Amino acid sequence: MTTVHQLSGHGPLSRLNIYSGASPYTQRVRPSYELIEAPTRQATNGTGSVSGSPNSSSNSTPANQGSLPSHTNPQLYSSITRKERPELFRSYSGNPRLSKPYASSKLAASSRTASYQAMSYSVSPTSTNSSVATSLNYQSSRETGISKDHWKPDSDVSVCSFPSCSVRFGLFDRRHHCRRCGDIFCALHCDRNIPLTMDVKFCLAGSLYRSCVSCFYEYLKWKQSIDLASSNDITVIESTIAPQQATTHPPSQPKNAVSVPIPKMDSTDSKGELPSESLVLGTVPDNWVWSTF
């Protein structure tokens, strides 16, 4: 015979514990919220029915004695709704239909975590690492395509080719080729950058390549000559434009101006007084009214 006892739990919920009549303390099954129902509701199982109060056992048959009611009947948990006891449905994980919203929320949370991780991976590294990576990419990109046929083999040189340098190449002092002359130098005498074309010629718009000190000074002389030639061209252009402007645009004079001759001084005058005509100097307009007094 199966008996159902209602016990008050320690938590906020009261659950029904089911015990077998033959062994009331050893055959304890997992409590299920599907068996919670109102005191006046009738519960049915897979083989029989239980009517009246929960403690009534008058209609039980020998076929279902010692067996547990079925937990898959959907009518057993229809008395309690989600609005009345939401905590029951929140804590219940056996029914996939009830736990679907919470599973989707967990899935959304996991997707957000994955997106945050992807964002953290996509963030650029520190300034030092980024500068190193940029310099390496720039070095590799600018080294592609330049001619290396004129480079001297490493086995031919064991000392720096700079005249006053005696550094011997080894484990700590490495060989460095000048991209223009192709000779081998130490790191100190091959640390300059000059713009070159693909056929290792000077070009102001070319890419920067490693060069030795001698080639760097040759580049400075070449650039100085280019600047001097450009400045001379500008001077020649200005000198040719100025006379053309002078001939095409002579100095302007007043429209209504009349030139009046200035009489010369008479050498016979002892006192050096000027004649009366000399009082009129410069130019006089046409509409000038002369006084008759």
Curated annotation (Swiss-Prot):
Residues 44-62 have a biased composition (Low complexity). One of its GO terms (cellular component) is fungal-type vacuole. Residues 38-75, 242-276 are annotated as: Disordered. Activated by glutamine. The keyword Amino-acid biosynthesis does not apply. Zn(2+) binds at C178, C181, C212, C215. Residues 63-75, 242-256 have a biased composition (Polar residues). The keyword DNA-binding does not apply. It holds the Pfam family FYVE. The modification Phosphoserine is found at S259. Keywords: Membrane, Metal-binding, Phosphoprotein, Transducer, Vacuole, Zinc, Zinc-finger. Gene3D superfamilies: Zinc/RING finger domain, C3HC4 (zinc finger) (3.30.40.10). GO terms for molecular function: glutamine sensor activity; phosphatidylinositol binding; zinc ion binding. One of its GO terms (biological process) is signal transduction. It comes from the Eukaryota. It is found in: Vacuole membrane. It is a peripheral membrane protein. A zinc finger (FYVE-type) spans 156-220. Functions as an intracellular glutamine sensor that directly activates the TORC1 signaling pathway, to promote cell growth when glutamine is available. Interacts with the TORC1 complex when activated by glutamine or cysteine. The FYVE-type zinc finger domain contributes to vacuolar localization. This is Glutamine sensor pib2. It comes from Schizosaccharomyces pombe (strain 972 / ATCC 24843). The lineage of its organism: Eukaryota, Fungi, Dikarya, Ascomycota, Taphrinomycotina.
